Structure formats: C-alpha cells, structure tokens
Amino acid sequence: MRPEYRNKKIEAYIRELIAQAIQKIKEPEFEYLKDYIVISRVLISKDRRFADVFVSVIGNSEQRKKAVELLEKYKGYFRTFVAKNVRLYTAPELRFKEDKGIEESVRINKLLDEIMSKEDENGSDN
C-alpha cells in the first residue's frame, strides 16, 4: 500500500475516532459543544508524529475560540483514545486548529452575490 494512501485512510479514521470521543465525554463543559462542533478534516504529517485536527464550530468567534481551547485541554484524552484504536508505532500528537474554510466560503459567496446584484442593477439601467 502506498504511504500517501495509507495516510489518507489514517486521517479519515482519526477524524471519525475524535468525533466518537467527543460524544463519549461526559464533562458538563462539553455538553453544549457536542451539537455545534464538526471535525472537518485531519492532516497527518509524513512521519505520522503529528496530526492537525481542523474543527468547525457553529457560533460566534468567541465560542469557536473557546471550543478549540477546550479541545486542546483534552487532547491527552483524545490521543489515548486514538492510540487504543489505531495500529501505529506511536499515536500522533494532536494539534487542534479552527477551520476557517466554511467561514471563508460564506464570505466569498456574499461577495459574489454583491457583484451579481450590482451587475443586474447596471444591466437594467441600460
């Protein structure tokens, strides 16, 4: 199996495992997060020592920041959960990051809508 393909499979499996681990946490501070957090993607380093976990959170910027901080606080739990379920020499160190891809796509769509509406206004004037 080619290493790139194996890494993609590992990334997908880690993404799934972290989502499962979040649902299993019984801490009160996680209760509100469970419905508003999405693990959008995982990128593992070539040597498989690090995994960047990109998180999308529905809410304002303060809630997103708090969610990433909370996930960072519990990253030892998540790493242990991954280690028990993935057959690797060592479990990768997890680094949680806010995924701004969804936010950026919404911003770009708004800009495109503005451009289209301006073009419609200019076209109807002539």
Swiss-Prot record:
PROSITE patterns: RBFA
Pfam family, one: RBFA
GO CC term (a single one): cytosol
Superkingdom to which the source organism belongs: Bacteria
Location in or out of the cell: Cytoplasm
Any single biological process term in GO: maturation of SSU-rRNA
InterPro entries tied to this protein: KH_dom-like_a/b, RbfA, RbfA_dom_sf, Ribosome-bd_factorA_CS
Gene3D superfamilies: 3.30.300.20
Keywords: Cytoplasm, Ribosome biogenesis
Gene Ontology MF terms in the entry: ribosomal small subunit binding
Subunit text: Monomer. Binds 30S ribosomal subunits, but not 50S ribosomal subunits or 70S ribosomes.
Function according to Swiss-Prot or TrEMBL: One of several proteins that assist in the late maturation steps of the functional core of the 30S ribosomal subunit. Associates with free 30S ribosomal subunits (but not with 30S subunits that are part of 70S ribosomes or polysomes). Required for efficient processing of 16S rRNA. May interact with the 5'-terminal helix region of 16S rRNA.
Family statement: Belongs to the RbfA family.
Name used for this protein in its record: Ribosome-binding factor A
Organism, scientific name: Thermosipho africanus (strain TCF52B)
Lineage: Bacteria, Thermotogati, Thermotogota, Thermotogae, Thermotogales
Chain's gene name: rbfA
